[in-house]
């Protein structure tokens, strides 16, 4: 008996393959979209983590004003938890690689254990006269070409490298330049245009400019566990590094003191000899010789000055631009994945309801016969559950594996444009995600079939064998509007009645098409929201051209001297204190870049702090101006109080005087009085700068750094804008994927509904053909109500899209990034038009099914 039902089920699949595929397709689409987007972040992070582990990307980067020697490296290598340590050289130089113009090249020494190079083409250097070039900056030259260090470099730069002509022997990728972007330099144009790696013996210096460390860590990329390991290890690394550097500094001081002592002894001896010679009446030539010896010793003494105590900088991966951007990119993908698939599963359930209800109504007689033959309700129900369940399971598995492979691959291909990472993303199999997908699929297919089948099987076999009585006709709302109803044609009246005749199909169509439109509205609006962030931040809020960081705090005299010395290129400067602090409220703590500018009356030339038409100025003492994104994450608003703590553990409570619009990074502003009274600081370590004229900002920034040794770095605002624009540009691929999936959703819904309508009205359509209706008229009989429902659904989708977009934006929470949630009229118009286009394409495909209806066969009696 079970074999017979199984055969019947298989025959049913073959005879109604279109319906079977419709359920399979909508499930595959929903699962693929859900699993594919959900696993994309994990796949991206796994690929990035594997690459960084293979290249042994540093955990700590150490820099010192004194440099490092081999003993320093050995001391760190022997420290607890340190697994590898490499000293490294770096120098920027003007180079020529065969082009017409010189460009800024950055030379790195090749390290053995940390930051390993990934060879893409050619080979690695074998001697000091060879180099490899980073693939991200490989333009204008080729393997075999020669890179020449230009004579126009400073003498220190020329002396830094052993050879001034280097042969390019390979192309590499380095984890140091994971993200392709702009890097500033103190020379030339101010922008690094080529990056080269050479053997360590190509450098002449005895001291390394930096040191890279790898330490024992646990946890994945960007995980809290990894961050905890770094936080626990950093004090020990800093202690060992400071001890080693200070010990060498003391050796240098001792050597200088010994030299000074020796020079002083020489001076004293010369003075004694001169005194004796003068008393003895020695000739002038002898006296001059003694004086020359004394002056020489004095010059040596004057030259032997004790250097300032060294400063040590311990940096982590978090300070690496590419590392941070990769984190933000993957987080945005994950946020979007949490929302979109809901529609697909909901529509899948409605498609299954419509399909299985229609199938069981068509097979009432067959069900009645099976009951009369002794088949139990459970056995009969199992036949239909097998039909929907097999379709759902196949669709789920197909969608899962295609989605978890396809979506990460497509998204990765877009991000690969901006990152020096492996060409292929690693495949991630997530059992938990697959089980969730299967559970939801079975609920939407077998669960729905069980609910639909129970009501049908409550009737007796005799009732089921007889045809079901047609539903009693109901007047719709339009029929009650007599003036309008009378003016409709016969076919138009049929269309109106059919629109509201089947409630499940009506809601499936409205939800499916409305969901399609809402998805497109959301995708297009997301694109606009993302793309507008950089322009809003750097054109309407941050108005400065560059930000200069100083090694030592500036006095008022230093600030005046800076402006006087750079008067030709600097139009204005806003001097400030800038430092990272922790801000807490409602049990939540975030890191913030705290700024305390000196208000010299031209604050508006550098910043425009505003929100909802309100302009904000510098806070009063005891107050804080906070950016909107951080305020939202802390759950605070104007008038609330927050706790702020600096790196020296000074803690104070400040009142929020305003919350201003800000989109990139976490920023807050306080007065100089608050800085001094609450944190005991009077530092001026940074300046926001506006340049004169329309000259190249990179050249002007390089000139600033060349002219002032106290400037450690100049950040160009336009470079930051370009980097964020590039980062958000890569999200366009997600917008395209969402639109394509929305089109597929519309097609499946329309195909399924049209297929059912044609099957139900096959005798009506055949009758129309016999009566002489043209093909277009017969097609319109079916498609007219589809078109009406498509328009209704699209209009509903426009409204739904507004709320859907707001919900999606609320889910996108990335630290240091905020977005304005808005939908433009163009978004609505494009979404509506695309939905109608998708519906029209579906109708073109379904015309063939109507044209194949055989009039004579279709008009035969169903009895």
Model-predicted regions and their roles:
Residues 1-32, 385, 474-515, 757, ...:
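N-terminal Sec/SRP start-transfer signal
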Residues 2-346, 358, 377, 417, ...:
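Membrane transport/envelope proteins' first extracytoplasmic loop
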Residues 3, 457-476, 848-863:
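Short cytosolic juxtamembrane segments of multi-pass membrane proteins
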Residues 8, 12-18, 350-390, 732, ...:
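Interfacial "coupling" helices/loops that link adjacent transmembrane helices in transporter permeases
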Residues 353-358, 363-365, 389-421, 432-458, ...:
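Small-residue-rich transmembrane alpha-helices
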Residues 490-621, 625-629, 640, 730:
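Juxtamembrane segments of multi-pass membrane proteins
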Residues 685-687, 703-810, 814, 818-821, ...:
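C-terminal transmembrane helical bundles of large multi-pass transporters
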């Amino acid at each position: 008996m079970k074999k017979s039902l199984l055969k019947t089920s298989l025959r049913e699949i073959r005879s109604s393959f279109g319906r079977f595929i419709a359920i399979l397709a909508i499930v595959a689409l929903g699962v693929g979209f859900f699993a594919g987007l959900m696993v994309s972040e994990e796949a991206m992070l796994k690929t990035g983590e594997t690459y960084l582990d293979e290249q042994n990307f540093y955990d700590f980067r150490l820099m010192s004003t004194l440099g490092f020697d081999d003993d320093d490296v050995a001391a760190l290598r022997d420290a607890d938890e340190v697994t590898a340590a490499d000293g490294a050289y770096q120098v920027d130089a003007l180079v020529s690689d065969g082009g017409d113009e010189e460009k800024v090249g950055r030379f790195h020494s090749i390290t053995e254990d940390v930051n390993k190079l990934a060879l893409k083409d050619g080979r690695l250097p074998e001697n000091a006269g060879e180099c490899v070039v980073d693939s991200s900056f490989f333009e204008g030259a080729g393997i075999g070409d020669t890179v020449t260090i230009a004579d126009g470099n400073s003498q220190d730069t020329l002396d830094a490298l052993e050879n001034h002509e280097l042969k390019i022997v390979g192309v590499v990728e380095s984890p140091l330049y994971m993200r392709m972007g702009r890097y500033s330099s103190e020379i030339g144009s101010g922008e690094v245009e080529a990056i080269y790696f050479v053997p360590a013996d190509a450098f002449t210096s005895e001291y390394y400019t930096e040191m890279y460390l790898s330490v024992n860590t646990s946890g994945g990329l960007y995980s809290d566990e990894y961050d905890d390991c770094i936080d626990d290890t950093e004090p020990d690394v800093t202690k060992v590094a400071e001890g080693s550097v200070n010990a060498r500094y003391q050796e240098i001081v001792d050597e200088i003191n010994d030299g000074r002592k020796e020079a002083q002894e020489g001076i004293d001896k010369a003075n004694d000899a001169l005194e004796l010679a003068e008393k003895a009446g020695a000739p002038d030539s002898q006296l001059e010789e003694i004086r020359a010896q004394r002056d020489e010793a004095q010059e040596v003494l004057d030259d032997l000055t004790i250097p300032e105590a060294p400063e040590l900088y311990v940096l982590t991966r978090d300070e690496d631009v590419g590392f941070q951007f990769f984190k933000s990119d993957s987080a945005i993908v994950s946020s979007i994945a949490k929302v979109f698939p809901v529609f697909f599963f909901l529509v899948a359930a409605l498609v299954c309801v419509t399909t299985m209800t229609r199938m069981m109504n068509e097979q009432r007689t067959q069900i009645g016969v099976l009951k009369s033959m002794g088949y139990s309700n459970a056995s009969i129900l199992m036949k239909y559950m097998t039909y929907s369940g097999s379709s759902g399971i196949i669709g789920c598995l197909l969608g899962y594996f295609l989605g978890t492979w396809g979506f990460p691959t497509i998204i990765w291909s877009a991000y690969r444009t901006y990152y020096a990472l492996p060409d292929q993303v690693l495949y991630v199999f997530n059992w938990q995600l697959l089980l969730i997908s299967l559970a939801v699929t079975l609920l939407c297919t077998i669960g729905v079939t069980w609910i639909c089948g129970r009501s049908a099987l409550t009737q007796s076999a005799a009732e089921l064998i007889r045809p079901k009585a047609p539903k009693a006709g109901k007047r719709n709302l339009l029929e009650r509007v007599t003036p309008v109803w009378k003016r409709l044609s016969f076919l138009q009246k049929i269309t109106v009645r059919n629109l509201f005749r089947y409630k499940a199909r009506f809601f499936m169509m409205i939800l499916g098409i409305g969901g399609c439109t809402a998805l497109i509205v959301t995708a297009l609006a997301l694109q606009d929201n993302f793309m507008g962030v950089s322009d809003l931040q750097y054109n309407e809020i941050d108005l400065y051209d560059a930000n200069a960081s100083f090694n030592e705090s500036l006095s008022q005299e230093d600030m005046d001297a800076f402006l006087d010395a750079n008067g030709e290129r600097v139009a204005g400067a806003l001097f400030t204190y800038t430092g990272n602090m922790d801000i807490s409220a409602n049990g939540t703590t975030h890191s913030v870049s705290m700024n305390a500018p000196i208000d010299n009356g031209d604050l508006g030339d550098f910043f425009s702090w505003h929100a909802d038409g309100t302009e904000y100025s510098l806070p009063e003492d005891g107050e804080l101006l906070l950016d909107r994104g951080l305020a939202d994450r802390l759950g605070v608003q104007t008038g609330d109080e927050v706790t702020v703590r600096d790196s020296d553990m000074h803690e104070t409570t400040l009142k929020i005087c305003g919350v201003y619009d800000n989109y990139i990074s976490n920023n807050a502003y306080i007065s100089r009085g608050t800085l001094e009274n609450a944190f005991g600081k009077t530092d001026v370590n940074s300046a926001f700068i506006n340049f004169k004229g329309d000259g190249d900002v990179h050249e002007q920034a390089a000139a600033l750094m060349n002219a002032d040794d106290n400037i450690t770095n100049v950040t160009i605002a336009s470079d930051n804008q370009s980097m964020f624009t590039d980062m958000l540009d890569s999200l366009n691929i997600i917008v395209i994927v969402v639109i394509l999936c929305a089109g597929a959703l519309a097609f499946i819904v329309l195909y399924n509904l049209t297929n059912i309508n044609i099957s139900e009205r096959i005798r009506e359509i055949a009758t129309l053909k016999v009566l002489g209706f043209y093909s277009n008229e017969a097609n319109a009989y079916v498609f007219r109500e589809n078109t009406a429902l498509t328009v209704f659904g699209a209009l509903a989708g426009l409204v739904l899209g507004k709320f859907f977009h707001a919900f999606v934006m609320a889910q996108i929470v990335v630290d240091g990034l905020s977005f304005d949630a808005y939908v433009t009229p163009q978004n609505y118009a494009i979404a509506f038009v695309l939905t109608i286009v998708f519906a029209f394409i579906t109708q073109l495909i379904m015309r063939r099914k109507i044209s194949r209806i055989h009039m004579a066969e279709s008009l035969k009696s169903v009895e």
